[in-house]
């Protein structure tokens, strides 16, 4: 908060404050970003990939279509799992780092009525999913050690690789 101090004899009513920007519309893009809302309706998104937050991560020496991030292909809490699962299969994903869930949670999702992520299930049953059950504190010792465990898992397995959390933006975005 800010406390306004007025010269003697002046009050808020007697002072005019003017705020201007360096350029017209200079903040408009940021304004629009802050107006974004998330829905759980597929029709509100341009594509299955946008809905599932399924993205190729091609930076540095990583080649195209070698490493992906997404929302959860196994936890259908947001209604995106089957979309992420289909995209993982189409991308030829061979190893998965699940930052959000434990093995017990994954097995619960698979056993749930209406589960519709057969590709993820096949990877899990083949030992190609590393369940890390990490929180969102990237500075925590357990996050650091869990991430190291996940990266070793990737090094021991062939790609393409997928890293995901629940929504695919915080933990997966950080990784």
Report residues per predicted region.
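Cytochrome P450 heme-iron axial ligand motif
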Residues: 167-175
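Charge-biased, low-complexity intrinsically disordered regions
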Residues: 1-25
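Cys-dependent protein tyrosine phosphatase-like superfamily
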Residues: 20-162, 174-175
């Amino acid at each position: 908060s800010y406390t306004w101090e007025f010269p003697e004899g002046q009050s808020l009513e007697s002072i005019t404050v003017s705020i201007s920007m360096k350029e017209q519309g200079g903040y408009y893009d940021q304004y629009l970003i802050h107006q974004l809302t998330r829905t759980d309706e597929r029709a509100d998104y341009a594509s299955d990939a946008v809905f599932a937050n399924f993205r190729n991560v091609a930076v540095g020496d990583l080649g195209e279509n070698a490493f992906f991030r997404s929302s959860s292909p196994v936890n259908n809490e947001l209604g995106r799992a089957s979309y992420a699962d289909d995209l993982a299969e189409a991308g030829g994903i061979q190893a998965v780092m699940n930052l959000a869930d434990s093995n017990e949670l994954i097995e619960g999702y698979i056993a749930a009525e209406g589960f519709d992520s057969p590709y993820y299930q096949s990877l899990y049953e083949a030992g190609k999913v590393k369940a890390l059950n990490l929180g969102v504190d990237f500075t925590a010792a357990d996050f650091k050690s869990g991430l190291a465990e996940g990266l070793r898992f990737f090094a021991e397995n062939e790609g393409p690789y997928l890293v995901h959390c629940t929504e695919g933006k915080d933990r997966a975005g950080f990784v």
